[in-house]
Amino acid sequence: MAQKIIGRKQEIKELLDLYKENKPVFAVIYGRRRVGKTFLVRELFQDKMSFYHTGLSPYELSGQKIMEQQLTSFYSSLVRYGSKGKKVPSSWLEAFDALINLLEEQDADKRQVIFIDELPWLDTPRSGFVTALEHFWNGWAAGKQNIMLVVCGSATSWISDKLLNNKGGLFDRTTDEIKLRPFTLGECEEYYQANNIVMSKFDQIQCYMATGGIPYYISMLQKGKSLAQNMDRLFFEPAAKLGLEFDRLYSSLFTNAEDCMTIVRLLAQKRQGYTRKEIVSLTKIPDGGGLSATLKSLEVSDFITSYVKYDYPKREVYFRLTDFYSKFYLSFIDGRKTTNPHFWQDNLLTPELTAWRGFTFESLCYYHLPQIKQALGISGVQTEVSPWKSRKEKDGAQIDMIIDRADRIINVCEMKFCEDDFSINAAYDKNLRHKLSTFAEETKCRSSLHLTLVTTYGLKFNEYAGRVQSVVTMDDLFK
């Protein structure tokens, strides 16, 4: 079944190797919601599973007896796989004992794959779920050579705290962990080809700017429609699926969803993000352990990224929004009163959309840093990457991306999203020279500065083109 899976070659190899091992396996797969965790495991092991269960979303169960509902659902899965239990377990200890009984009735010489999806959702308040899971693994499964327990979760911070960094009975018990990330541009292209969706690379990049390479989102695209038609259908028509996704997404992942959404909305306002101190001041969320946990949860779930600006003496940490879907939603849907179901088609050439493409292309380039390094021939060179802005000029020089290399070269990267080859004119050449000289003067760097252009189609040759040392095109980003 693995041939149906787009990309994920390393993850497929890892899971199949674990399946072939003659020892107990406790594998944890985590990553952002909608990224394809469930699909990956089901396609690989659908005819090999001895038990499969998925937790119920607390978002959908709000106000109900959540633990009771989760146990009832778990019992239904047990019965589906042959359990002879006559009643719904009253606790998670009983539920896992019933699972042990079910597995012991099956062939002990055969590899038994147990797949529990959305595991964090089962851990409702005061449920004792983690203790019961410890009992199941330490007291039974860890002693069975044929057991392969695979658990998935979108609540990445829960996975990190309760499994990967557990200080109790599950300390150091997981045998393998896989973080599943969104598709790259190249993997998206592979998906489109496999599903007969015809789209130019130029449009694929714009699609990525809105969907972030999330497999579930791009699976909604309809072949035979233009990108603009699909954008309107998914985001702007009445009851558009992705127009309604934002609240559902955060509420299903985070127990403190309101604080998370407040921080994300703030970070969406400024491309380079804010410091922790600024976040406290602007959101009025109290500084302390709660804020630390919230920022950590957002970061491990790949919604935000922390970084330190190049050559800033305080080494102050900044947080910026890096989830493409969230940025798109907050830019064009959140709080808007427009009811135009053809908003995207009607505004393709407006300054607002042109500016959005330019800013978001920078984020896309950061996500595809490995492809940029490969194009520059420095994949094996240690690098530090960040934006830079002059500290001496109020509205002065700033550089989209600095790649500071261990071989004493600094790639000063300019990102340009264009519909044709990019042309450097006299004014832009002057601007570039100012950026390079200001950067060299303020940072006192001793490395050689290589001006690098990352753009869609390439650089038009003229009298100013020689200043550019290297060009990375969108074709390189798809590799």
Question: Model segments located where?
Answer:
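A cross-kingdom feature that marks ATP-driven nucleic-acid transaction machinery
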Residues: 310-312, 317-479
